[in-house]
């Protein structure tokens, strides 16, 4: 693997020299004074210069890093799938080009793999060797004083500033020079990933030995394997020289730092080596102060880390954009690789990613300087440890991270520190001890550190010994062996991690290897952006390594992703968030990765701190104040991320609280680092609970995680709580060792350089708002100076002012630290802590910048760690703490207030995180639950406001908060909180009330564990936390952080009900709540009280909850005595005001079901609202509800109906809908009448008379309908109808044009429920009216009545009247009257219709009638027949004549012969009109009925029929006429062969006579013997014809001849002679006759020979 270091840019050596000079200068002032202000100033200047150089380099590197980041993402995704054993950062050094750094960002493993593919392992190994050599040298140096460290940090900070500037040029996002170690790395990062990313082979030459050498062995190989492509793509030869230069500078700086760290490592084994080295010296100087000094150092360190993170976030935003893009692809593979590599690879990967960005170079340089020698040792050990850990992690995924991975990987962690890939424990021990010592220390620290950060098995249950449950126990380092305690603590963290779920799994990183890798990549990108971030990376790497050890392989990768995501978010809280947005493509994965990585780093740092109280994180070896500042940022980051963790803190909560309380009290004796570790562990738990990714595993682990997370979480309250707890332990420890920067670098990469350059980084970080970071890498450079000042302040108390300048000042926290005050952030309204109180809202001074709170948080955590029981004492700085709570908006979402000090710190840190993490929070919140990040951002934002007067920081914080709020708003859980958060942002963030003592309710302690306690329930996303009691506490905390949300509503709720659901604005956010959310039967009064309260508050969420509660309760139970209709009306009105129309409809429908109708005004308001808003789609549902309400008994006046119809027209309702309303109007009138006139016939009769007087027949119809519905007895109703009939038939004046019956019938007929009974009654009333008008001879009115009956299809002919004679009238009479009315009114059709309707019935057994009625019918029919015949309506006339009396049945004794005239007249008319068919029918009917028929008409008919060729009918009628005597009989002439034909016959008649003659003589004609005989025809003259002229007879002759011709076949006749009577005699030719017979004999014989009658 070792490779020759690539020839770096020409500037690299110079930079190294500068770094070395910076180291020297930093050592001097650091030794001279704790603050190191003087040297810091110089360091700041130099660092600024170097930053400029780095910025220039970064500008170029950014472009490359972007490309490489994209490639890395791909490689990372591929690599993350398959976890590989640890790969050396040396392998990552194969990233000779700047693109390799982006690849590292994407994933350590990918970058490692890429490095391998590049074949640049030799360069990496060479770098490692250099770093190791430097580490050895630094280790050889006995110990550096805190002042030396601070000075070195200051110098590094200055150098980093310059590097940062240069880095900005090289990379899109360059971290501010706040991180001293990162500054050195940043030089490399300009060309490649700085030391902060071990994956950067070229850039991290110095750094890789520091942070990633040990870790690289396992991870580098894998990352190289996985990321060869991405690394190659991303590695940019242009960056190589810069990386070399940076590496050289880093090596120089790292040598100085390592020397200092070596002294500390020798003093402090494990994570505390750096911090405790500072602490030891500082504590030696302030031995009387003891823990307070440690706390101060941690606070300063946290502040520096915060600042670094802030600047990192700014720088990282750009670089991270590139890195995240790469990280996104690399996340998937990184996760698996990290799992196998125990998150050390994650760190490396992130380091590589960071190398791509300017942040990484800056970070890598300082870290390399500090941790080179220890990490060389650690690398060897770490490689082995990684292998072992990878195996152990695979086996012990469920085991506490610290237990398995912490012990062996201490050295490994040391190397991991330099590379974020290292596990948490590895990070801590890496500081300056040998690999073995570090591993041991880490094992011990892991026992005491919060196990949450440790790899998560994915289980929700945490062992009772987990940090979440026994953070106090974790703190007891003295009581337990450090290794064992660390193991236990890691176990707890592991448990917590399991509780934390996927995000805690980030710490465990086994399950979430991908996310961890992404996190690391993001972290790396953050590191690239922020110099301090690189420092954080090593720490986070160390933290992640333990995570990888257990379940962490999978989860460590996840943690890496989350941690790096957190780091990016944290560092970029202001800047990183922007970076994250820039890295939109890989933003989500990167965010998750960063968060997880940060979490892992934080937890690792916490573990490291626990393992070796004396140990200080290598990268945290920076100034104590810087480390403290960074811890705040880390807290903020962690807080935001912790929200993602879901830890059931309720389990064994009471016992654990007690233990934590007792331990916290006992831990006053313990080092502040332990306390911080414990607190961080608790906070990490909460963070996990809320932010799986954010919360690392344990207090110590979360500490390191916080480093990486700090930049991200700095913008959220959750960061304060989480980081406060996480950072507190490691920073207290680191504060002594002045290595909190490492821790911060792990979490945010700002912290990593906290020791030497964390302040600078923090300044940059703080100066970089989320927007700034994202938007402006130069902003980092601008803020690098403030960071430098901050770093100097951290070393010399100027941090606060510088942070103010940076907009992230930490005045209160620094003061508190200086004053040895423990700042505690507590929610005054937290019922778990203080019971339900009305102090939920906290005033937040907008003056304090967000970042300033982070340093305070760091100080608070340090003080908390140093003095577990001093948390109450440090309530004096509670303003800062409250400022931290001020991020309550963030806290609400992230539940940052899990621990008191953590809560306060979280709030302050949240503000800080808001500045640096604002944008990071967006990333984190998008990857995690937006609520947590937003909470982090808000809390950090609020804290900054409280802490710093810098308004710019506040603005940035607000921007961050607004961004976070927007993200959160996307999440329903955070929606309400976001609004309040925005409000809080606008408000000043100041918590005037001192925080109550940490000793609170067990539940409260679990949630808000004292900063001493490691319980991280404060982490950002309380909504994510599904904790039982802790979750409730977190909810209250969040609500309090948000102000109104956390404030109880003041309801007195029975204990069996969930007070959060009923008594808070946010409601219960637990997935499964054991308390009731719906009142039980008998608690209707509770319902009403809740409704009243919610209505009075008039909040949208509460009104929705009230509506749902109403629906759920009254679906089960009926309204009782406590039901208040006014409350229902108020609820509906409030819902309508908030445009909750759906809920309004639901409640209305349920009200109808339970028969509790709302007020009419509510219904009208709903119609008005729908009409005003033009909600056409809502009209059908509204009409449905309207109809149901009316049917249920609601009464509306006619004007109300008219108004509703008007509104419906406005909304363009359909005709059907409007008709439905009108129908309901009529039905309502009926109901009203029914209600007023129930069976009250007397009143009804009076009403009838009243209607009669007024002539209001429509109203009479309504009266009828109402009576019909109300009457129970039909007889009574008939009486009433008789009264109506009388009214309609009496006293009617002719002058009135209208017919009362018609109006009345029209009204009644409109009733939809009209039945046959109604029709019958109307028909009977109509008959009475008809009789009435018939008597009055008012034919027109009578006809109107008949027309109405016809229109209504009422068959009145079968009915009888209701009153008078018509009541007994026969049917014939009724029909006669009706027909007569029609006839008199001129309607023959009407008359015929009536007759037909009655079936012409006159007198039948069923319908008997009088003779007078029959006579009347005869006369009526005759009259009708004459009128119809006059109109030539022969068929109708014949129909009428056929139905004359006497024709229907035999009972009628009428003589039909009297109808002869009528029929003959009809027959004549038909013949005249040539209606042969009708004529034939009439003739047949007359013949059949024996009606005398006129022969002339009959003969005419026969002739007409024949001429019309209707021979059949002609022959039939001729035969009938012959039988009737119309023709003379043939007598006997037939057989004499003589035919006598009268001359008056027509030719048709003559032919018919000839046919009969032929048929009669057929036998003789056809016989052969008779051929001699002749057939003679005599045209006989009649006597009448005698007197006539000859012409008539001659015409008869012609007719005869014609008759013979028309025959078929023709007949031939010959004139023979004239007889005596002068009659012509003709002979019929035999042949023609024979022929005719042959053809016609068949039918002719039938017709003529047989009688058909």
From Swiss-Prot:
Subcellular location: Cytoplasm, Cytosol
Leader peptide range in chain numbering: none
Pfam families: Asp_Glu_race_2
Biased composition (Basic and acidic residues): 58-69, 221-236, 858-877, 920-942
BP GO terms, sorted: apoptotic process; ectopic germ cell programmed cell death; lncRNA transcription; spermatocyte division
Region feature (Disordered): 1-88, 212-238, 553-591, 855-893, 919-942
Keyword Cytoplasm: yes
Record keyword Cytoplasm present: yes
Major subcellular location class: cytoplasm
Top-rank taxon, per record: Eukaryota
Keywords for the protein's UniProt record, in alphabetical order: Cytoplasm, Differentiation, Spermatogenesis
InterPro entries noted in UniProt: TOPAZ1 (IPR038952), TOPAZ1_dom (IPR029435)
Ranges annotated as biased composition (Polar residues): 561-585
GO CC terms, sorted: cytosol
UniProt function note: Important for normal spermatogenesis and male fertility. Specifically required for progression to the post-meiotic stages of spermatocyte development. Seems to be necessary for normal expression levels of a number of testis-expressed gene transcripts, although its role in this process is unclear.
Designated name of the protein: Protein TOPAZ1
